[in-house]
């Protein structure tokens, strides 16, 4: 049996569609599972933040309580797998604790989205204690699914982990929800859909707007929109992407990027830096090395009357097959390059 531990639902983020699509896949494949979802009601996010740290901690504690009750009542048995939609999960060590005392052969698997092992991630300031927590995660887990080789290599460089546990699968983009918005007439709209935080450098988008207008004397009448500043429904957001000509990122941290993946599927020209995950996911796309290049790329996109070809970054069914059909691995040793090299 699969014990499925989803993320809390946050409207406007990938958590809602991922939960829906995972359940649809499990039902279609006739996979026996129990979903640990204490509530689908989520309070509004604090202004400027993409999660509510207090609520997500409470939500995860409720999930641990439900899983503990399943261990206590004997509903979890040898051969079962516990799958976390985000394995960076405070309290996950209690699963290993219960496994030890019940002597149940239960696999722990899940997706690693980010962590303090990335120097430019917003949680980097927690590394003093978070690195110990992350080492626990990598120790007690059987298989950890990575969105990209970029994050996998980051983990191997910075944490104690058996590399064989880390499996690159990509993430499931909600293409079915995007199809309705394809084929719209393109307008001179440039989009920045990253979070408004230091690691995404939104102020460079302001400078981009200034320099594009200066170089074209404002003759392109372009709109530069930060979607996080707009109060858009999911449908309105997708419609805006469908009408836009370019999607821009100045990210200093990105392990996958749902927002860019959605935009390029809807025919936006990607204007992306030549770093992080972007060379891996967009190998046939011109990427910029200097800010000035991004200005020229946006002007080129705005002047073009041809629609940029739609791109598919990942196949959701392939991702789900890897998550739920692949046998989990049992690690043989821990590995950390800096220690190995000293021996």
What are these regions (language model features)?
Residues 81-88, 99-121:
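Active-site proximal beta-strand in glycosyltransferases
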Residues 124-144:
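Membrane-proximal helix-turn-helix segments that form the acceptor-binding/catalytic region
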Residues 1-91:
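N-terminal pre-catalytic "stem/leader" segment of glycosyltransferase-like enzymes
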Residues 139-179:
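Donor nucleotide-sugar binding/catalytic pocket of nucleotide-sugar-dependent glycosyltransferases
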Residues 251-252:
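Aromatic "clamp/platform" in nucleotide-sugar-dependent glycosyltransferases that forms part
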Residues 269-272:
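Short hydrophobic beta-strand element within catalytic cores of glycosyltransferases
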Residues 292-343:
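A charged, aromatic-enriched C-terminal amphipathic alpha-helix characteristic of glycosyltransferases
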Residues 174-210:
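Conserved donor-binding/catalytic core segment of Leloir-type glycosyltransferases
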């Amino acid at each position: 049996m699969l014990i499925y531990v989803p993320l809390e639902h946050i409207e406007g983020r990938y958590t809602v569609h991922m939960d829906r699509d995972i359940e649809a896949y499990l039902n279609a494949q006739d996979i026996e599972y129990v979903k640990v979802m204490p509530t689908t009601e989520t309070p509004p996010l604090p202004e400027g933040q993409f999660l509510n740290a207090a609520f997500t901690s409470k939500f995860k504690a409720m999930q641990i309580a439900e899983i503990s009750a399943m261990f206590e009542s004997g509903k979890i048995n040898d051969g079962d797998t516990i799958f976390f939609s985000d394995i960076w999960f405070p309290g996950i060590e209690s699963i290993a604790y219960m496994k030890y005392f019940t002597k149940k052969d239960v696999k722990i698997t899940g997706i690693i989205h980010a962590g303090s092992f990335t120097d430019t991630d917003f949680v980097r300031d927690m590394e003093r204690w978070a690195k110990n927590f992350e080492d626990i995660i990598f120790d007690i887990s059987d298989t950890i699914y990575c969105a990209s080789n970029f994050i996998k290599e980051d983990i191997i460089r910075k944490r104690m982990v058996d590399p064989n546990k880390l499996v690159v699968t990509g993430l499931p983009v909600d293409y079915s929800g995007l199809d309705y918005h394809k084929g719209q007439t393109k307008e001179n709209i440039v989009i920045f859909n990253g979070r408004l935080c230091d690691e995404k450098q939104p102020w460079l988008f302001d400078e981009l707007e200034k320099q594009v207008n200066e170089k074209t004397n404002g003759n392109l009448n372009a709109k530069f929109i930060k979607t996080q500043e707009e109060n858009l429904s999911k449908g309105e957001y997708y419609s805006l992407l469908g009408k836009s000509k370019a999607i821009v990122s100045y990210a200093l941290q990105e392990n996958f990027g749902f927002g860019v993946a959605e935009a390029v599927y809807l025919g936006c020209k990607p204007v992306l830096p030549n770093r992080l995950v972007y060379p891996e996911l967009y190998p046939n796309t011109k990427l910029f090395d200097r800010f000035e290049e991004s200005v020229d790329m946006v002007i080129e996109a705005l002047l073009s009357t041809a629609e940029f070809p739609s791109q598919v970054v990942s196949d959701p069914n392939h991702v789900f097959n890897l998550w739920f059909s692949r046998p989990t691995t049992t690690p043989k040793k821990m590995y950390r390059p800096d220690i190995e090299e000293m021996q």
